């Protein structure tokens, strides 16, 4: 009888031993594997939201994976800044270099634009959306402003006009006026 009761105790103890072993393994795993940060989780969620918008609104021209189709160029490596500019201004370049497509009405919220930008940025490296300290004029001295003016005259005024008023260009293209364009979009257009 003594042997029989020992067997019963062992049989009853097996589930508890298994539970304890699983608990030890789980605790060890949680110590060894670093937890994902809330920033990573938010970025993953933002990319998923961007993919949902992209699949419905962009993939018919740019392909399901941004690889490009005959109606739209590849977006691999264009970066978040390019997407923010295109979607934030409604200005998408023509895919084959013909006359410029007129600007469309901006129909997405900044949150949606940020989500699609994050999704497209996941295709490959490219320019990020700049921080406001990179494009806001606050804190610039007279020398920096003069340098910016010289850069504009050398690189931008031929199309946008000496005062940024825009104008007609060859082959049916048109350079838009820059007066109402947000600083971030001008910065992104220059970088992308």
What kind of feature is each model-predicted range?
Residues 38-73, 77-85, 90:
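Extracytoplasmic low-complexity, Pro/Thr/Ser/Ala/Gly-rich segments
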Residues 44-60, 84, 141-163, 187-188:
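Sequence/structural segment immediately N-terminal to covalent heme-attachment motifs in c-type
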Residues 30-52, 69, 125-151, 171:
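Electrostatic cytochrome c docking/interface patches
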Residues 130-132, 137, 160, 169-172, ...:
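Short, intrinsically disordered, charge-balanced linker/junction segments flanking boundaries
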Residues 55, 61-67, 79-80, 88, ...:
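Detector for the c-type heme attachment site
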Residues 1-46:
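N-terminal export/targeting leaders of redox proteins
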Residues 2, 32-41, 63, 91-105:
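Sequence context of c-type cytochrome heme-c attachment sites
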Residues 76-124, 172-192:
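Extracytoplasmic electron-transfer domains, predominantly the class I c-type cytochrome c fold
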